[in-house]
């Protein structure tokens, strides 16, 4: 199956016209839709998206994201197992710049045998994933 993990960096690039990756995000998203890719994300990524969209773009943009974009994602709801494995990965990475949200996304992607990510965050390619953005 053509499954792609979606990161906050791609969501923000898609929604923010002034984002440096906006045009690339639009092209990638259009291609993913044409390919009928299964888009998965984590509940942690959604929380991060809601927080950043609300703060940077306002409540109208948050409502639009919730109504039009969030339903496109299959959400992997994070439990204590994924959370703990994300923390382990975070500690093992020895990188102060890697976030728990990203570490948990790595865990979920590997659990689902996902190799491709819709992301502009270099942590994903450094972790061995292929960026589609």
What annotation goes with each model-predicted range?
Residues 1-40, 54-67:
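Short, well-structured N-terminal submotif of metal-dependent ribonuclease cores
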Residues 1-3, 46, 106-107, 111-133:
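Acidic, PIN/NYN-like endoribonuclease modules and their adjacent C-terminal/linker elements
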Residues 6, 40-41, 77, 100, ...:
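Short beta-strand scaffold positions
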Residues 31-32, 69, 89, 93:
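Hydrophobic helix-cap positions at the C-terminus of alpha-helices
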Residues 35-39, 72-74, 113-115:
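Short active-site oxyanion
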Residues 75-115:
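Active-site neighborhoods of divalent-metal-dependent phosphate/nucleic-acid chemistry enzymes
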């Amino acid at each position: 199956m053509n499954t792609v993990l979606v990161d906050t960096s791609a969501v923000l690039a898609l929604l923010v016209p002034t984002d440096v990756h906006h045009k690339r995000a639009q092209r990638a998203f259009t291609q993913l839709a044409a390919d009928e890719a299964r888009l998965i994300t984590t509940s942690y990524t959604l929380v991060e998206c809601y927080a950043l969209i609300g703060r940077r773009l306002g409540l109208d943009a948050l409502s639009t994201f919730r109504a039009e974009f969030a339903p496109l994602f299959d959400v992997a709801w994070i439990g204590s197992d994924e959370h703990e494995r994300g923390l382990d990965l975070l500690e093992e990475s020895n990188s102060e710049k890697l976030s728990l949200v990203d570490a948990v996304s790595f865990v979920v992607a590997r659990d689902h045998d996902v190799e491709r990510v819709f992301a502009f965050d270099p942590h994903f390619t450094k972790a061995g994933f292929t960026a589609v953005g």
